[in-house]
């Protein structure tokens, strides 16, 4: 199903200008309508897959909180699936209809999926643990928020068919940020694309008025601070573990 037809942007701007409405406002309204039409087409076409992805993510999250922790490779596989799904099903198939830059976004998301698959599934370097510290609280708040994301948007927009739901880039990024804060063995490279998307998606959230995405900058800043703090602690630890050579006079 394609997106519903609307007047092109030039026609909209001309009409709004004749009505005395600022062009910047007209552009924002047009972009918002086009985006929500896109969400409607996306949700209608792939909703069964979105339900499966949400259930899988919720089950893994609950198991991670319980004593029956799922295998780390399963969690890494789920994260890789999130990113490749957003790359292909959302960016490449749908978002490119209204934004050519979506091809670049799709490429970034494919890279992130490949990183998770390589580090977590092939090499098995990622270990997701139930920590008990301040960062764990932040991590679980982000995970919970991402799972509640469809409901938060539904409260604001009221129409399920036209809202951003699970299985789109923004909740994927928030969910990923939370799990990365619970992961041992995660390289800082795994945080690059998620942080980039918190900037891109966060700016779009304010333009389109998607309030559920206002959490993106918080997720991004939290992940940056967490990653820098972890890298600093690792550097200090390695410095203390390096054998010192004493030179006797």
What residues fall within each predicted segment?
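Aromatic-anchored segments of alpha-helical transmembrane domains
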Residues: 81-89, 141-152, 195-207
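Short juxtamembrane and helix-loop transition motifs at transmembrane-helix boundaries
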Residues: 13-16, 32-43, 63-71, 93-100, ...
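Membrane-interfacial loop-to-transmembrane alpha-helix junctions, especially the N-terminal start
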Residues: 70-80, 131-138, 184-194
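Hydrophobic cores of alpha-helical transmembrane segments in multi-pass inner/ER membrane proteins
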Residues: 51-62, 107-122, 169-182, 216-231
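Membrane-interface capping segments at transmembrane-helix boundaries
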Residues: 121-125, 228-243
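Loop-to-transmembrane alpha-helix initiation sites
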Residues: 100-105, 207-221
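Membrane-proximal helix-loop-helix units in multi-pass membrane proteins
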Residues: 101-177
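N-terminal topogenic module of multi-pass integral membrane proteins
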Residues: 2-96
């Amino acid at each position: 199903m394609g997106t519903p037809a609307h007047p092109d942007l030039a026609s909209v701007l001309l009409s709004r200008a004749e009505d005395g409405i600022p062009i910047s406002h007209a552009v924002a309204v047009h972009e918002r309508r086009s985006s929500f039409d896109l969400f409607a087409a996306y949700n209608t076409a792939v909703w069964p897959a979105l339900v499966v992805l949400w259930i899988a993510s919720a089950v893994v999250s609950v198991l991670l909180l319980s004593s029956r922790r799922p295998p780390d490779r399963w969690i890494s596989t789920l994260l890789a699936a999130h990113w490749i799904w957003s790359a292909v099903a959302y960016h490449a198939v749908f978002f490119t209809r209204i934004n050519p830059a979506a091809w670049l976004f799709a490429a970034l998301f494919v890279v992130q999926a490949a990183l998770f698959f390589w580090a977590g599934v092939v090499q098995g370097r990622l270990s997701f643990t139930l920590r008990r510290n301040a960062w764990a609280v932040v991590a679980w708040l982000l995970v919970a928020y991402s799972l509640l994301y469809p409901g938060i948007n539904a409260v604001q927009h009221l129409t399920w068919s036209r809202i951003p739901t699970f299985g789109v880039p923004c909740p994927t990024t928030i969910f990923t940020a939370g799990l990365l804060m619970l992961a041992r063995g995660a390289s800082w490279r795994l945080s690059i694309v998620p942080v980039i998307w918190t900037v891109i998606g966060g700016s779009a959230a304010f333009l389109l008025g998607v309030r559920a995405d206002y959490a993106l900058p918080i997720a991004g800043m939290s992940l940056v601070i967490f990653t820098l703090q972890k890298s600093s602690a690792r550097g200090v630890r390695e410095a203390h573990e390096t054998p010192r050579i004493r030179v006797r006079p």
